[in-house]
From Swiss-Prot:
Described purpose of this protein according to its UniProt entry: Possesses arsenate reductase activity in vitro. Catalyzes the reduction of arsenate [As(V)] to arsenite [As(III)]. May play a role in arsenic retention in roots.
Source organism of this protein record: Oryza sativa subsp. japonica (Rice)
PROSITE patterns linked: RHODANESE_3 (PS50206)
Residue positions of the active site: C70 (cysteine persulfide intermediate)
Organism superkingdom: Eukaryota
A cellular component term, taken from the record's GO annotations: cytoplasm
Protein name, as recorded: Arsenate reductase 2.2
EC number: 1.20.4.1
Length: 130
């Protein structure tokens, strides 16, 4: 199980996204509806994140690395990543999660660096965005 939260850059994340054992968790609140998102990401808004921890655990079953982000990854992304790590530490169930990471500079940094974004309205995003 993951022992701590680490950070990953957008450049490092791009090749990681090809691995089916990676999940991206977007914890932005309403701005995700209006902005784009990383294709295939799971959306668990920070304002209700604590209540949805078991749901996230189920949705990411079999994943080894979870990468959390908000707009800037300064507050919501890191705090939700830590909350999920604490949840896994206290949960009675087995977890495949070995790494919990936060995307440096968040979604805004991802988009500003020219990384691909998805503008679909699917929930959850199926990851086949153009």
């Amino acid at each position: 199980m993951a022992r701590g939260v680490s950070y990953v850059s957008a450049a490092q994340l791009v090749p990681m996204l090809r691995d089916p054992r990676i999940a991206v968790v977007d914890v932005r609140d309403e701005e995700r509806i209006y902005d784009a998102h990383i294709a295939g990401s799971h959306h668990y808004a920070s304002d209700s994140f604590g209540e949805r921890l078991p749901e996230l655990a189920q949705a990411t079953k079999g994943k080894e690395t979870l990468v959390f982000h908000c707009a800037l990854s300064k507050v919501r992304g890191p705090s939700c990543a830590q909350m999920y790590l604490d949840y896994l530490s206290e949960a009675d169930e087995d977890s495949d999660v070995k790494n919990i990471m936060v995307l440096e500079r968040g979604f805004n940094g991802w988009e500003l660096s020219g990384r691909p974004v998805c503008r679909c309205k699917d929930a959850p995003c199926k990851g086949v965005c153009s």
